[in-house]
């Protein structure tokens, strides 16, 4: 885990240095490709595990329960955060026209279609693993870890190379930094309730609930860290559970962030989005029809959670 964190922070510094030299890195395509490779390798591990395939339905129900509990907890705690700090709802900047409403629906559909690529990549990996189309060694945690390190480096470079990072950081105050803390506590406290009815320990439930929508990083980190402790098969099961939980969170956030933001409940939208408040869900939270106040709240929240995921998993795993 120290290796992962070192790569992350070194890459953030490198990205900032490159930006100061006048270069803007285009990391989106590289990040997408690396995520798809990771998800395919993860699917390969699942397809090679017959016991896990037989338990797929029970894992699906467990993921739905933990994801639902975590999302409810994050939204409730963001409301508590708002009440404790006496923060009003952020008003909508401009009313929406009928044409813009149609465009918004089209944009949402495109984003949902983009997210649907990941389950398809996962399924393709599972089929290749099940039918033995690729060497079994490709599904090992060692191969996934190498690709994971590449992803971590790309994430760090992308964060450090953000042109708006300095501006966003200048707008940060103590209140904004508290929101991700409430998101973490609310998500984990409510996710922990799943341990009462599910055949997983409290520690394992907290582990799989600590992704905050960051499906690619959390699932592979769990696989890498847990394999040596509980065995490859059990680690793949937990990592699969984590992947499904975080995919569900992103899909729900894509649907609900826009109406929440437009009703002035920006803190709830940001908290629900988790890590994706800074990228995938950012256009739903910050656009021409919402307040410009939303941007620093959403970006800082996403950055803090993105850094907290490997830190939390290093403790829980």
Feature names for model-found ranges:
Residues 1-12, 32-33, 37, 62-73, ...:
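Structural signature of hydrophobic alpha-helical transmembrane segments
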Residues 23-25, 82-120, 279:
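Intrinsically disordered, low-complexity non-transmembrane regions of multi-pass membrane transporters
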Residues 10-11, 15, 62-97, 177-228, ...:
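Transmembrane alpha-helices that form the ion-translocation and gating core
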Residues 10-16, 31-56, 124-130, 144-169, ...:
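Hydrophobic transmembrane alpha-helices of secondary-active transporters
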Residues 20-31, 48-64, 85-91, 111-112, ...:
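Interfacial helix-loop-helix linkers and transmembrane-helix boundary segments
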Residues 7-17, 38-45, 69-79, 118-131, ...:
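Hydrophobic core segments of alpha-helical transmembrane domains in multi-pass membrane transport
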